[in-house]
Amino acid sequence: KASAMDFDDLLINTYHLLNNFPEAILKYQNKFQYILIDEYQDTNHVQYLIIKKLAALNENICVVGDDAQSIYSFRGAKIENILNFKNDYPDYKSYKLEQNYRSTSTIVETANSLIGFNENQIQKTVWTENEVGEKIIICKCGSDSDEGRLVANTIFEIKLREQVFPKDFAVLYRTNAQSRSIEEALRKQNIPYKIYGGLSFYQRKEIKDVLAYCRLTINPNDEEALKRIINYPGRGIGNTTIQKLIVISNTSNISLWELINNLDKYDHKINKGTCSKIEEFTTLIKSFISQKENQDAYFLAEHIAKSSGLFNDLYNDKSPEGVSRFENIQELLNGLKDFCENNEENLLANYMRDVALLTNQDNEKKEDFNKVTLMTVHAAKGLEFPYVFVVGLEQNLFPSLLASDSQENLEEERRLFY
């Protein structure tokens, strides 16, 4: 419709062109007589088919890659492309580059030991001439909160003892949702941090949406919260209607909440169907307000997330991004549960006061340079730090629950940890 193509379209249409038009494939086979491909383990199926077409005439093809670093199957990468190269080109020559120049021998030997459990791989033995280095330390924690505190306290101690900087530390986790407990612990120690390639926990859209419902429950006159969620999840109250309501509330010198509870008193020119939707929304929020003094923060927030439709809206999105957003909501509720278990004053209003302090820190503009780096293991590929923590190494977290259904997926989790 837009006369445009995304990256996948470009690949698929290139393949169709080469497959269906003999003059096109002949032209490009003669044009590209030598083909070199880097990071071959990350290629997907259609890229593989394009490569096969282009290389078929001359078979002058050189691929570079490491099957043990194939960690992007969720993007369509096929480890079989590199594993089966020898079958596609029987006259191939293989050169193994096994010396590691970056890591200590302790890390190299541990990684070799780990990846050795994978059956589906090209056999190799990585080695290094580097020093032995420090031992890898394994810590057991009772909960994610304990783990966050342990990481923050250890960073604080090493910083003082070794006279190093926050930028020398990285904390890696399997999913973005795991950052919450780490972020909260670092903030309590006043240790600056940044989320690499993403937003801090309380800046993520789905978290802001749930908290906006909570803010409106505590204070119905919070107009920013009301405007954010009056039509989310979608309930048929469009932007035009919202703008009309804002104008009326401003000219009548009343709050938006007061207006939408007394619409029949004002000349609004909003159709009956939309008025009915607005009434349903106010009834929903009033039901939350009625519980704010007699239910704890966890119970009420979970009820809000489910009754508002927000929980279902995210649950039904099965894309990788949707799954990540749903995990973030679950992690927010875990945080609320921790709050209720550790505080006698555990009403939603008390929790929101604590969260306000955390989100205010997010809004402070600070330099990104000298901060602890928090990121997923996927995002860490290719980076290095003097001190690294890997958190959440437990069944169904890392390795992921999604990996438990097949040997292939479990081996990818092992490659990811490698």
Tell me what each language-model feature is.
Residues 1-84, 99-103, 304:
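Conserved helicase NTPase motor core
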Residues 30, 49, 109, 113, ...:
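Generic recognition of well-ordered alpha-helical segments
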Residues 57-60, 66-68, 89-94, 132-136, ...:
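Short glycine-/polar-rich loops that comprise or flank the Walker A/P-loop
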Residues 65-68, 75-79, 99-101, 111-112, ...:
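A short beta-strand-to-loop transition that corresponds to the Sensor-1 phosphate-sensing loop
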Residues 68-75, 102-103, 196-218, 230:
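Short alpha-helix plus adjacent loop in nuclease-associated cores
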Residues 70-73, 103-109, 116-117, 123-124, ...:
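Switch/connector loops and helix/strand junctions flanking conserved nucleotide-binding motifs
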Residues 90-93, 98-192, 215-219, 251, ...:
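Helicase P-loop NTPase motor core
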Residues 179-191, 204, 211-418:
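Conserved helicase C-terminal RecA-like lobe
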